[in-house]
Amino acid sequence: EIIQKRGITISAVTRKVEVIEKLCYAIVDKFKPCGSFNVQLIIQDGVPYVFEINPRFSTTIALTMEAGINEIELSLSDKHSGGLLPFTEGLVMSRYYDQLFWGAK
């Protein structure tokens, strides 16, 4: 679940949401992707609406990996046969930025 986004995800939390899981299985059945992809959607009144599907690793891959799923290794090994892998639910990621200056003034 993306909590805050401005181009790149600023804050997110891992959650298992059955309606999203079913939607993603339907996307896989329809498009038969080979490799990683991410789905961007919004949920309104309990209904998910997809607005983007990206054939790449998500910018939140660090959260995925910290939650226990090494998506890069799975892609390289081609060992994943389908199904939802176990992951740590409720894990929160927050990004922050700062300005660094160096060199002559």
Model-derived regions: residue spans:
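ATP-dependent carboxylate/phosphate-activation module, predominantly the ATP-grasp catalytic core
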Residues: E1-K32, N54-S77
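Peripheral (often C-terminal) accessory segments that flank ATP-dependent C-N-forming ligase machineries
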Residues: Q44, E73-K105
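Protein kinase-like catalytic core scaffold
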Residues: Y49-E52
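Short beta-strand element of the conserved SAM-dependent methyltransferase core
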Residues: E1-I2, T14, L41, D98-G103
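A short glycine-rich, hydrophobically flanked beta-strand micro-motif that places a catalytic Asp/Glu
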Residues: C34-D45
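Residue-level preference for alpha-helix termini and adjacent loops
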Residues: S36, R56, A62, E66, ...
